[in-house]
Amino acid sequence: RRSLPELDSNHIQPLKKEMPSELGSFNETRKRYEFYNGSTIQFQYLERDSDCDRIQGTEIHIALVDEAGQMTPYQLGYIKSRMRLGNYTPQQEGFLPRLVMTANPGGQSHNFLKALYIDPAPAESYFFDHTMRDPNNPADKGWLTMYIPAKMSDNKYIDPSYASSFSALPEELGRALREGDWDLVVG
């Protein structure tokens, strides 16, 4: 997310409400959930590109980026550059870093996301993210990637009247958001 209030209301507060206290506790100062087994869930917002400095040196195993279309291409690339798993054993190979992003059509990274994740292959088909390829290893094809489309109607938890609120938007954008159609709008 782009701001602490967005991060707090959409992710931190729901997690604090749902996470059983037997598993760990939330550290308000560090904005992270600390499990008693030593694992953590770190919450971070990136309002400006310069905020990426706060995650420099961070080893991220799993990154979950909500509303990726609102981030800049630089921020999304920087997050990807922090994805690593140091000193892992062959048994841990299946736990290599994972990046999951959610995004709606539109936003400042619309064209970036569409070109990198939506256009390269049919929906729900694996392909390689060539930007995550080791240039010194000709055998490395990049990260295995998949685009999973979604429509507003796929979310059974949304109030049925929510769709009507999109009538206040330009018609093409409202339709793109309802249908999850990345071809309807230009970022």
Where are the predicted features?
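Phosphate/NTP-binding elements of NTP-utilizing enzymes
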Residues: 1-187
